[in-house]
C-alpha cells in the first residue's frame, strides 16, 4: 500500500481475503492499527509487513544491522528532515499536533508532539536543524526489532511556524 494513510481498513480487507500486505504508512495511529491486523494475520498465515518505507523502514534495517555489528546498543534516536510531496507535507504537519511516544527504560512515554527541542545535525547541505518530538511509529517498530534497547526517540525538523500552525488545518 503506497498511498497516504490510512492503510489499516484496506489492509484488513486484504487480509480477510488472504492477500499479503506491505504498508509504507508513517502515521502512528495507522501503524498501531496495522500491527493489530498483523497479529491476526499471522494466525491466518497471511504476511503483513508494516513500515516498508524510508522512515519507518530503512531505519529498522539499519538498527537491525547495527545490533548485529556491535556487542550491545542501548539507545536509538531517529531524526527526520524534509518532506517529499503534498501527502508527506500533510503528514509532517499533522504529526506535530498529536502525541509523541518514546521508549524509556522499558516503559512507553507519551509527550506532546512539537515539544522537546533538540539540535540535530544532518549531512550537508542541510546542516543543523531544530528537531522536535512528533507522532511517529518509529519507536514502536524499532522496539519490536531490538527489544533490548533502553531508549528510543523520534524527532522531526520543524520551524516555529510549523509548530505554531500544527494544530490548525493545513490549507
What are these language model-derived features?
Residues 1-12, 24-32:
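N-terminal glycine-rich "phosphate-gripper" loop used for MgATP/nucleotide binding
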Residues 25-48:
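Rossmann-fold NAD(P)-binding glycine/threonine-rich loop
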Residues 3, 26, 51-55, 131:
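Glycine- and other small-residue-rich loops at beta-strand/loop junctions that grip anionic moieties
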Residues 13-14, 41:
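Generic structural signal for hydrophobic
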Residues 45-84:
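Adenosine-phosphate binding glycine-rich loop
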Amino acid at each position: 500500500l503506497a498511498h497516504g494513510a490510512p492503510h489499516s481498513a484496506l489492509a484488513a480487507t486484504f487480509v480477510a481475503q488472504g492477500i499479503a500486505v506491505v504498508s509504507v504508512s508513517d502515521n502512528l495511529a495507522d501503524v498501531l492499527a496495522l500491527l493489530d491486523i498483523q497479529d491476526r494475520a499471522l494466525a491466518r498465515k497471511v504476511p503483513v509487513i508494516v513500515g516498508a518505507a524510508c522512515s519507518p523502514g530503512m531505519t529498522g534495517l539499519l538498527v537491525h544491522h547495527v545490533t548485529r555489528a556491535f556487542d550491545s546498543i542501548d539507545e536509538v534516536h531517529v531524526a527526520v528532515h524534509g518532506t517529499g510531496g503534498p501527502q508527506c507535507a500533510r503528514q509532517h504537519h499533522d504529526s506535530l499536533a498529536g502525541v509523541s511516544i518514546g521508549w524509556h527504560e522499558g516503559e512507553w512515554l507519551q509527550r506532546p508532539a512539537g515539544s522537546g527541542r533538540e539540535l540535530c545535525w544532518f549531512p550537508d547541505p542541510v546542516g543543523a536543524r531544530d528537531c522536535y518530538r512528533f507522532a511517529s511509529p518509529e519507536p514502536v517498530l524499532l522496539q519490536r526489532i531490538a527489544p533490548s534497547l533502553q531508549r528510543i526517540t523520534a524527532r522531526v525538523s520543524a520551524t516555529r511556524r510549523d509548530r505554531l500552525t500544527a494544530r490548525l488545518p493545513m490549507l
